[in-house]
Amino acid sequence: MTEAMKITLSTQPADARWGEKATYSINNDGITLHLNGADDLGLIQRAARKIDGLGIKHVQLSGEGWDADRCWAFWQGYKAPKGTRKVEWPDLDDAQRQELDNRLMIIDWVRDTINAPAEELGPSQLAQRAVDLISNVAGDRVTYRITKGEDLREQGYMGLHTVGRGSERSPVLLALDYNPTGDKEAPVYACLVGKGITFDSGGYSIKQTAFMDSMKSDMGGAATVTGALAFAITRGLNKRVKLFLCCADNLISGNAFKLGDIITYRNGKKVEVMNTDAEGRLVLADGLIDASAQKPELIIDAATLTGAAKTALGNDYHALFSFDDALAGRLLASASQENEPFWRLPLAEFHRSQLPSNFAELNNTGSAAYPAGASTAAGFLSHFVENYQQGWLHIDCSATYRKAPVEQWSAGATGLGVRTIANLLTA
């Protein structure tokens, strides 16, 4: 193992020879990051990405000024999907070190799970990984049920079964119950619902290669809410929370669903399929029906749902939708506290009616007359939330994954959103 490169922090500007905009400098003792007080966490993350780009794979965070947030900012920029890296962490107090260790364990799990090839991570594997993570932090306070394949059809989970039946790998619903109270009759405080499409070809509405090559990450919503629950537990979550992961492949085969098919859901809604690549909302609907049946105070669903959200926000923000202004404000406050990027996009009553069908109550995609794709997708989901005007948040996870590296992130998953949702659950 090579000797560690020392990384220190300074509030003084770099020597003029490095240029007036220099964020780091190099000397015989190692590398100094020059903080300016404007965006210190972002500066540290961007510098870490540059340090990794220099091929430095063993570092020691040394000297004064390091805390859990600054260490984490460094790791977010330093971590990448290829190769190995070693960080020697500075001395932190017990609480800060525990917080950092929990982030490293759980959010790295989220990033690594999203980055996993679809060949390795099918619907069953995703569900089991989620169970293993939550069980690791919750112990005997968690129970779960896995329903798959034809059992889904027999039990009325028609959206999930319809989307997933075209794959040889059976679709799976994970229903997990975290109940720290020990009381089987305890009310459910919150339900988390995640889209777990482990590979999305688009189905018969097939994607072009440029839009399909990152679709191993289409289970990013499921990974995010799983990580959020695990992280909230490490922060002392003492309320009952249920997790529903809707896991499937969306592939083409002789048994795959087709345009013009009509899906009848357990709540009586009939949906005409006019785009098999708008499959995420079809599987989430089943999870939202189950979540609503629990009568929780709070329902949060997370999904890499629309390209429209990415068009609006790029990969820099998660898109937030809600009819509940107070709840949306609480989520945005949590995001601010955790230094994670969320941006609220419009969701109005009229978006719920912008999915007309000639043959069913709903179409699974908006027509050219209604181009607000992210908002109409949220409007679609609202039809499966019993009390959609209160207590429901929809997160379109546009900041989950990057196809190419940028100055602060490597290519691949980011893990953004985990801490914000956990913060809201424990507030």
UniProtKB/Swiss-Prot annotation:
Subcellular location: Cytoplasm
Record's cofactor remark: Binds 2 manganese ions per subunit.
UniProt KW keywords: Aminopeptidase, Cytoplasm, Hydrolase, Manganese, Metal-binding, Protease
InterPro entries: Leucine_aapep/pepB, M17_PepB-like_N, Pept_M17_PepB, Peptidase_M17_C
GO molecular function: manganese ion binding; metalloaminopeptidase activity
Residues the record lists as binding Mn(2+) 1: D200, D277, E279
Subunit structure: Homohexamer.
UniProt xrefs under PANTHER family: LEUCINE AMINOPEPTIDASE-RELATED (PTHR11963), PEPTIDASE B (PTHR11963:SF20)
Protein name according to UniProt: Peptidase B
Name of the gene: pepB
